[in-house]
């Protein structure tokens, strides 16, 4: 049996962690995904898949001063 591609795994986990109302930063999303996955996930990995989800239109990017937040659309 083939394993699920990492892209599909991480995008599903990120969408499960994100909220429709409350925006979250990359570190908060990383902690949530790490908790659900049961192992530490790199900040760069989360950022990579967040940018992919943003480009697909599943996630909205919010700029608040120096902070970059994300929420589900």
Regions found by a protein language model. Give the residues of each.
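Short alpha-helical segments that sit at the start of domains
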Residues: 1-23
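Short acidic, hydrophobic short linear motifs in intrinsically disordered regions
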Residues: 23-33
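Key DNA-contact positions within bacterial/archaeal DNA-binding proteins
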Residues: 44
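Short, hydrophobic-biased segments on the C-terminal half of alpha helices
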Residues: 47-51
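A short, conserved structural fragment
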Residues: 54-64
């Amino acid at each position: 049996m083939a394993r699920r591609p990492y892209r599909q795994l991480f995008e599903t986990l990120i969408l499960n962690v994100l909220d429709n109302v409350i925006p979250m930063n990359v570190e908060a999303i990383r902690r949530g995904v790490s908790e659900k996955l049961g192992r530490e996930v790199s900040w760069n990995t989360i950022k990579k898949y967040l940018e992919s989800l943003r480009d697909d239109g599943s996630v909205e990017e919010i700029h608040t001063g120096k902070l970059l937040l994300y929420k589900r659309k």
